[in-house]
Design a protein with these regions (language model features):
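N-terminal transmembrane-helix/juxtamembrane module of multi-pass inner/ER membrane proteins
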Residues: 16-94, 141-146, 150
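N-terminal amphipathic/basic-hydrophobic helices that include classical n-h-c signal peptides
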Residues: 1-17
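Short hydrophobic alpha-helices at membrane interfaces in multi-pass membrane enzymes
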Residues: 185-198
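Aromatic-anchored segments of alpha-helical transmembrane domains
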Residues: 52-53, 120-126, 195-205
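Membrane-embedded alpha-helical segments of multi-pass membrane proteins
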Residues: 86-93, 166-173, 216-217
Length: 217
């Protein structure tokens, strides 16, 4: 995983150095938001809307019954603290692809954002109509760095609204975006992005953040 991450960062650095952005965002003004040059930025408004709705569902909605998500396979999957690394890398994985497409491939940015808008909105509707949770987290033992980091993750992230998994959806949004970009269509790139998406998806069940059902959903 570390070698793969280094390769991704090294390649991304070379790409950023070699290419100039398609649009000079220093020229952006709110008055120009509806112009052909900048109107794709309106898609970014989804993020604060999603965050507000998700925050409400997590912290402020009236008390409801949360259906526990579990299946027999969950109990065969051991907890593995090492998976906190790809789990945390998800934020860079998704954010990095959004930034890359925003600067260097506007059509791919639009398609990735619409994929996220549709799938994340579906997830929010599911959380609203079918409140769900998981009770799979183990008692953490030990004081090493990875265990402490996982403990902080557990403390910051509730065990509710887990199916479908936003981590899995976001990971494959990046993979599909990579397939959509000519620079990343080489077999090595596609395999790298797919491997990372699968690792992040696996991390959700090995960290006991999600049931296998959440991943499949």
């Amino acid at each position: 995983f570390i070698l793969l991450t280094r390769r991704v960062f090294s390649a991304a650095e070379r790409i950023l150095i070699m290419k100039l952005p398609l649009i000079d965002y220093r020229q952006f003004r709110l008055s120009r938001l509806n112009t052909p040059q900048f109107r794709h930025l309106k898609l970014l408004l989804f993020w604060p809307i999603f965050s507000l709705v998700f925050c409400y569902l997590e912290n402020y909605r009236p008390t409801v019954y949360y259906a526990p998500m579990r299946c027999a396979l969950d109990h065969w999957i051991p907890f593995c603290k090492w998976f906190v690394i790809p789990y945390a890398f998800w934020f860079l994985f998704v954010g990095g692809m959004l930034l890359y497409t925003l600067f260097y491939n506007i059509p791919a940015f639009r398609r990735m954002m619409w994929f996220i808008i549709l799938t994340y909105s579906f997830a929010l509707v599911t959380y609203l109509l079918f409140p769900n949770c998981q009770h799979l987290r183990p008692t953490l033992l030990g004081g090493d760095l990875l265990t402490r980091f996982t403990a902080k993750l557990y403390a910051a992230d509730t065990n509710t609204n887990v199916c479908p998994s936003i981590h899995v959806i976001g990971s494959f949004a990046v993979y599909f975006a990579a397939r959509d970009i000519r620079r990343f269509r080489a077999k090595g790139w596609r395999l790298g992005f797919l491997t990372m998406a699968v690792l992040i998806s696996l991390s959700t069940v090995f960290l006991k953040q999600h049931s296998v059902l959440d991943v499949l959903a």
